Regions:
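Conserved catalytic segments around the Walker B and adjacent sensor/switch elements
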Residues: 2, 20-32
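Sensor-1/coupling segment of RecA-like P-loop NTPase cores
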Residues: 2-8, 98-122
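C-terminal alpha-helical "lid" subdomain
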Residues: 9-17, 137, 141-208
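Conserved catalytic network of the ASCE P-loop NTPase/AAA+ motor domain
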Residues: 20, 65-70, 97-104, 122-128
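Conserved NTP-binding/hydrolysis module of P-loop NTPases
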Residues: 24-27, 35-53
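A short helix-turn-beta junction within AAA+ P-loop NTPase domains corresponding to the substrate/partner-engaging
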Residues: 25, 120-137
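Central P-loop NTPase core of STAND/AAA+ ATPases
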Residues: 45-70
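Conserved P-loop NTPase "ATPase switch" module shared by AAA+ and STAND
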Residues: 66-88
Length: 208
């Protein structure tokens, strides 16, 4: 079992969805409204199983049977921090039961609070974790590489790097959204050089 944590906008979901294109990789994206039954149905759907009509226990057994018959699968549960709180751990216990009784690898991903929630409320799951990765965002060189090909003034480059790497609010998503608006402004004005003023204009189009 593996755990991947990182702040919103760091690229977890995009990366996991790309990986899920590989054979025998099943991907489920969770949300706050999911019940235990919804989670089971989402796993059934991503595996191509017909949605069951029995109890959750019977349907989970069907999922276990699938993994034990079709060996070599990886099950990715994204946004898993939305499944657990101090009031409910049932949905995560379903995942632990599938992992314990199936021949399947499981990767659970979410925001940093997922790590604390598992350690606090799900000790039996925590001691099953073989691999743990905490994403730290883009490096300065990665930002520079991403911006290659753009004509950027030095102060504009510094601002874009801050948007990508600031520990409080910086992330790839903010950098990408800013650049999208910058391109719109340049296209409308016929310009080619990204300046600090243009970045400020681009920011004015966003909710920051």
């Amino acid at each position: 079992m593996g755990i991947v944590v990182g702040r919103s906008g760091y690229g977890k979901t995009h990366t996991l969805k790309q990986y899920a294109r590989l054979p025998r990789v099943a991907y489920v994206e969770c949300d706050d409204t999911m019940s235990a039954r919804d989670l089971v149905e989402a796993i059934e759907r991503t595996l191509g199983l017909p949605s069951g009509y029995g109890t959750i226990w019977k349907r989970v057994n069907g999922i276990r049977d699938f993994f034990n018959t079709n060996r070599g699968y990886l099950l990715i549960i994204d946004e898993a921090d939305k499944l657990v709180s101090k009031y409910t751990q049932k949905k995560m216990e379903i995942l632990r039961a599938i992992y314990d009784q199936s021949d399947v690898g499981v990767v659970i991903a979410g925001e940093p609070k997922l790590e604390a929630a598992i350690k606090t409320y799900l000790v039996r799951m925590a001691n099953r974790v073989d691999f743990y990765a905490s994403l730290h965002g883009l490096s300065e060189q990665e930002v520079a590489d991403y911006l290659q090909g753009y004509d950027i003034t030095p102060d504009a480059l510094e601002e874009l790097q801050a948007r990508a790497r600031n520990r409080q609010t910086g992330c790839f998503r903010l950098l990408d959204r800013t650049l999208s608006n910058v391109r719109r402004i340049l296209a409308a004005s016929g310009g080619e050089t990204i300046t600090l003023k243009i970045i400020q204009q681009a920011s004015g189009m966003m909710m920051l």
